[in-house]
Amino acid sequence: MEYSEVQQIAKKTIEYAKTIIKPGMNLLDLRDLCERKMLELGADSFWYWDIGAFVFAGDETTVSVSGKKYVTSDRTIAENDIVTIDLSPQCENIWGDYARTIILENSVVVDKREILN
C-alpha cells in the first residue's frame, strides 16, 4: 500500500465522522467508531502508541497531549461544540497522519462553505 492510500483511509474516516457526530455522543464511542472505520478501510494497526483516533471536544481541543499519556475523556458532545479528531492509521508499516477540527452549531456539523459565506 502506498502512503497516499493510507492517507485516504484517514481522510475518508474524517468524512465518515462528520456524518455520525451528534450532540450526546460520547467521545469514547466516537473514537471507537473512527478506529473501526480505519480498520474496515484497510488499516492493519495504529502507529502512534496504538491509538488510532485522538478525540477531543470543547476546551480539551486547546491541550497538547502525548500519546503515551492520552486517555479519551468520558465527555459527551454538546449542541454547540468543537471536536478535534487526530488519526494515525498504519498499513504494512506505512503511516498516515491526519487531523481535522469539526464544529457543531445548533446540533449540525458546520460545512466549511457555510463559514466562508
Residue ranges and their predicted role:
Residues 1-117:
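Active-site neighborhoods and metal-handling regions in enzymes and metal-associated proteins
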